[in-house]
Structure formats: structure tokens, C-alpha cells
Amino acid sequence: MKKNISFYSEGVKLDGDLYYPDDLKKGERRAGVVLCHGYTGVKDLYLPDNARVLNEAGYMVMTFDYKGWGESEGARTRLAPYSRVVDVQAAMTFLGIQPEVNDERLGIYGTSYGCATVVWTAAHDERVKCTVGVVGMGHGGRWMRSVRRPDEW
């Protein structure tokens, strides 16, 4: 089952989805995973497929759009790396307070730029028990120069 939700990060309303395993029993608490999209991604692009796979493995899953992306509110012209970390932490908080989630068993997953975000988050937030990074970038400045003209900096 999928349920659309919203939560706040730094006072900005973010859009997300919760995915519930089909075999979840009333009163049961499962490990939870927050899935994070990359630089130009949105939660509805490829994360629903990943959420379904994790649901089949028994996890509660949450996807969301960062501030200024997809259905979330916020400035559309700004990329603020640390602000994305704060968004992931807010998503973890929201997921962790769901009655179906064991807040002692939270994981984060990110692809591309989302990989860099979850690695940083895991290094600075003790709630993270598991981190998966896929297709991460290695050098942020070099990468940014490859996708933006100098006059766009």
C-alpha cells in the first residue's frame, strides 16, 4: 500500500510517499528505509520500483522530494547540499515516528547526488543504522562544472 504524506524541513513543506509491506500486521513495527533521489530526480521517477522491492523484503519505505523539487515547496533555483541533508534527517524523523516503524532500525538509500547526501547524513546522524549509496559522485566541484556553465554558478 502507498500513502501520500507531507512533512516539514526547515519550515518548508515536503511531499512524500509511505510504502507499507503487504504482510504488515496490526501493531507490528518494521525497519524503515528512506529513499533519496539524485540531483535532477524526483521521488516518482524510479524510487517507487525500489520501494516495492524493499516492501517485498519486509521494510517500511519512504520516498520524498527535496525542497524545491517535484511536488515539494521551496525555491526551484537553488541547490544547497547541506539543506538536502537536513531534508533527509527530517524524513528520517517523520518515518521514525510512524507506529509501523521501529525507530531503532532506520536506513537510508541514495542514488547519484542522493548517494553523496546519504553518505554525509550517515556520518553525522547516529540514527542511521544502514546506508546504501548507488552511483555516487566523487568530486562535487568537478561534477558541478560538468553540468553547469560558469555563468550559472
What does each model-found stretch correspond to?
Residues 22, 68-70, 140:
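Feature marks short, surface-exposed loop/turn motifs that line or immediately flank catalytic pockets
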Residues 62-64, 134:
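The conserved SAM/SAH-binding core of class I Rossmann-like methyltransferase domains
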Residues 25-29, 37-48, 53-62, 70:
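Short substrate-entry loop that stabilizes the transition state in hydrolases
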Residues 6-12, 24-25, 52, 56, ...:
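N-terminal cap/leader regions of alpha/beta-hydrolase-fold enzymes
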Residues 1-31:
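N-terminal cap/lid segment of alpha/beta-hydrolase-fold proteins
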Residues 90-153:
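Primarily recognizes the serine-hydrolase "nucleophile elbow" in alpha/beta-hydrolase
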Residues 34, 50-53, 78-80, 125, ...:
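Glycine-rich, phosphate-binding/catalytic loops in enzymes
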Residues 42-46, 62, 69-104:
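Catalytic nucleophile-loop/oxyanion-hole region of alpha/beta-hydrolase
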